[in-house]
C-alpha cells in the first residue's frame, strides 16, 4: 500500500472505513487504521479493571487483542455502532 492511499484512508470516516473493510477483509491498511482509531476503547475498558490484581499492561494487551477480534467480526450492515458491538467482546476477554 502506498503512502498516498494510506493518507486517504486516515482522513476517511470510520463508517466508510468499515464499508471498505467489509468488502475486502484482506486490506491491512484499512484494518490497521481502524485498530488505531479504536485503541482508546481498549484503553478505557482496561482501566476499569486496573485494581483487580492484574497489571494494567496485561489488561491493555488483552483488550487490544479483543478489539482486533471485534474489528474482524464487525458487520456494518447490521446497523450497530462499533463501540456497542466491541464493548462486550473486550470486557468478556478481560
Predicted regions and their residues:
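Alpha-helical promoter-recognition and RNA polymerase-docking modules of transcription initiation factors
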Residues: 1-94
Amino acid at each position: 500500500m502506498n503512502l498516498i492511499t494510506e493518507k486517504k484512508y486516515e482522513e476517511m470516516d470510520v463508517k466508510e472505513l468499515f464499508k471498505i473493510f467489509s468488502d475486502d477483509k484482506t486490506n491491512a491498511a484499512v484494518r490497521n487504521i481502524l485498530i488505531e482509531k479504536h485503541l482508546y476503547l481498549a484503553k478505557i475498558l482496561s482501566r476499569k479493571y486496573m485494581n483487580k490484581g492484574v497489571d494494567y499492561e496485561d489488561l491493555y494487551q488483552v483488550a487490544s487483542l479483543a478489539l482486533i477480534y471485534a474489528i474482524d467480526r464487525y458487520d456494518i450492515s447490521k446497523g450497530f455502532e462499533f463501540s456497542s458491538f466491541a464493548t462486550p467482546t473486550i470486557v468478556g476477554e478481560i
